[in-house]
Amino acid sequence: MIHIRYKLKASEVHGIGLFAGEPVKTGQLIYTASPLLDLNITQEQFNSLDQKEKDEILWWGFFDEPSQKWHVDFDVSKFINHSKNATVSQHASHKEAHLVALRDIAEDEELTQNYLEFETEEDLLKRGIKI
């Protein structure tokens, strides 16, 4: 669930991006997981899907090692693009999925995350994401 006002619009990073709809302060909570709405499935369930369904999960989601489940967000957080100079990140003190601002973020600035926090370089390259 996104906890700030936001906008979806064309991104200079890739396709559509998620942009702050208000000024955001360093450390401010941006996103938390929504266990009742997000998709969380086991490897066995993933294996039972047809290839098109798997492709959707591989594109929009990721395999969460700690829970040993495939995860896909239900909300617009899926439009947070990758950047090595990310504006948001997970804080090590939280065990559940969440994102906080790494620095002050201006209104209309794109929210980005370093995908290497939860995926390998190999995974990103397979998806065509520039590292």
Where are these regions (language model features)?
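Conserved catalytic SET/PR domain of SAM-dependent protein methyltransferases, capturing the structural core
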Residues: 1-131
